[in-house]
A protein has these predicted regions:
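Short hydrophobic alpha-helical runs that function as membrane-insertion/retention elements
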Residues: 168-172, 226-228, 290
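Glycine-rich beta-alpha junction loops
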Residues: 43, 175-177, 222-226, 230-235, ...
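Short phosphate-binding/catalytic loops that engage adenosine nucleotides
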Residues: 34, 90, 224, 287, ...
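A conserved regulatory-domain signal marking ACT and ACT-like small-molecule sensing domains
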Residues: 237-400
Length: 400
């Protein structure tokens, strides 16, 4: 007998027919003699709809009250799935995050899981029940409901798998695995049979929508092997593990991220500590910085540009104007950009990867404004309107 954790996203339970389809997948797993814990997201666009309703009432609602509202979405989906499983004649219980033992910190809207008290989960497993858990949520030390942020249900599933030492953690989505590019936009995108944690983490961070990056971080930390597969099509998916078994491809994927802003500070004084002052202030406001470019002038000044999420652009500009505006520096933001990235451990042992990528963009007539590299990633900043064209050109260069 194995313990299987299964996670189903909002699209997998978007309507009654899909809820019944998920119930069939879950009960088929249970019939094989397995213990089953299922983590479910809110149906379809429920979370977005709830946010819209909140904004109609109070656009500046507190994060605590927003979390109270948003946890309602998962409560609906877990109860409907439990009803579907009951209809099929199987023992089942649905649990909210706090009932399942999820304890978090107090960061409303983006809470971190501190621990899971597994007694209730283990008790229900001992009764041979299928357990349906609301993803994306928990409770803090003040007994307030909290949410884990976008993609938090992936993290909930991995956390349960780690806490109970599950034999498998399956992440069901609307695609059949992890692909070399978005298969809905690139016709010859190839499905990967497996991928390393590090490669998957880079893909998730750089714009791939298949897995939440925090869930991959947790899976790597606790050695939870993940399987990404479709709830709509029955076929093998992609395994995410420490070491990929398939022969290393040069790269594993091409991603685009259009939620990007380029922030530029032009004419700041070229003195020790200014860059530290800049990035420490941004870090204090939890603004994550990615690609960085610095150029030094001949008049005792320097220019620094960097990228961050477009949602943080206005706040970043305000911080930097307060820091350097009186010195005569000019701060600006540009959200008409996109980041195109390639990811793959294979590039560590192969030369010419960057030139191949840059050549593909050149042939497509696409200019590069910024470049960032790591051991397994190369990212470039380009015009946003050319993002899809760039992904297609780079994918063709590496995969044909």
């Amino acid at each position: 007998m194995s313990l299987i954790v299964q996670k189903f996203g909002g699209s997998s339970v978007a309507n009654a027919q899909r809820v019944m389809n998920v119930a069939k997948i879950v009960t088929d797993t249970y019939k094989e003699g397995n213990d089953v814990i299922v983590v479910v997201s809110a149906q379809g666009d429920t979370t977005d709809d709830l946010i819209e309703k909140a904004n109609e009432i109070n656009p500046k609602a507190s994060k605590r009250e927003m979390d109270m509202l948003l946890t309602a979405g998962e409560q609906i989906s877990i109860s409907l799935l439990a009803m579907a499983i009951e209809k099929l004649g199987y023992p089942v219980v649905s649990l909210l995050g706090w009932q399942a033992g999820f304890n978090t910190n107090k960061a409303y809207g983006s809470a971190r899981i501190e621990n899971i008290k597994t007694e209730r989960l283990q008790s229900e497993l001992d009764k041979k029940k299928i357990i349906i858990v609301a993803g994306f949520q928990g409770v803090n030390k003040s007994d307030d409901l909290t949410t884990l942020g976008r993609g938090g249900s992936d993290t909930s599933a991995v956390a349960i798998a780690a806490a109970l030492h599950a034999d498998r953690c399956q992440i069901f989505t609307d695609v059949t695995g992890v692909y070399t590019a978005d298969p809905r936009k690139i016709e010859n995108a190839q499905k990967l049979s497996d991928i390393t944690y590090d490669e998957m983490l880079e893909l998730a961070t750089l714009g791939a929508q298949v897995l939440n990056n925090r869930s991959v971080e947790m899976a790597k930390k606790y050695s939870v092997e993940l399987e990404v597969l479709s709830s709509l099509v029955k076929e093998p998916g992609t395994i995410v593990r420490e070491v990929a078994k398939m022969e290393k491809m040069l790269i594993r994927g091409v991603t685009k991220d259009t939620d990007v802003a380029r922030i530029s500070v032009v004419g700041m004084k070229d003195i020790p500590g200014n860059a530290f002052k800049m990035f420490s202030k941004l870090a204090a406001k939890k603004i994550n910085i990615d690609v960085i470019l610095q150029s030094v002038g001949r008049d005792g000044t320097k220019d620094i540009s960097f990228t961050c999420a477009s949602s943080h652009a206005a706040e970043a500009v305000e911080i930097l104007e307060d820091l350097f505006g009186l010195e005569g520096a000019v701060v600006s933001s540009d959200t008409s950009v996109a980041k195109i990235s390639i990811v793959g451990a294979g590039m560590q042992s192969h030369s010419g990867t960057a030139s191949k990528m840059f050549g593909a963009l050149y042939e497509a007539g696409i200019n590069i404004s910024m470049i960032s590299t790591s051991e397994i990633t190369i990212s470039v900043l380009i015009e946003k309107e050319l993002a899809d064209k760039a992904v297609a050109a780079v994918h063709k260069a590496f995969f044909g």
